[in-house]
Amino acid sequence: MKDTIVAPITAPGTAAVAVVRLSGDRAREIAQSAFSARLKNRVSVYGALLDEEGRVLDRALCVLFEGPGSYTGEDVVELSLHGSPLLVREAVALFCARGARLAGRGEFTRRAFLNGKLDLTAAEGVMEVIDAATPAELRAAASHLGGRTF
């Protein structure tokens, strides 16, 4: 995939922490342009998320996962912010203004499938785990994550 996508990967609403994920060719560049500390592969780095004027929006943890060793098989950046819905919207808008586009539902998993990181059963299992409403549904869905069926 040539474009870079961004979306919150935690449930919407107020929480202690929210995570925003970027994936694609420019994920590292876009995230680094708005983060005060230097990103390092597979290292959680503490720094500031900066707005367009360089003002601090939040103090955050940021992790870079260089492709192909990431969930999607592409460069991925995950930013752990305080869980304010406004802050999450601002972070996503900031990354979109710098060249990312808003990811569609399931698009990170779709990319993982297309890049050979998940087989079809595992990709469907991710969505089933997310949508599970009962313990039995959750157990059945979790069994698909490894790509096996019963």
Task: Identify the residue ranges that each predicted region occupies.
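A glycine-rich (often HGG/GG-containing) alpha/beta subdomain
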Residues: 1-139, 143-147
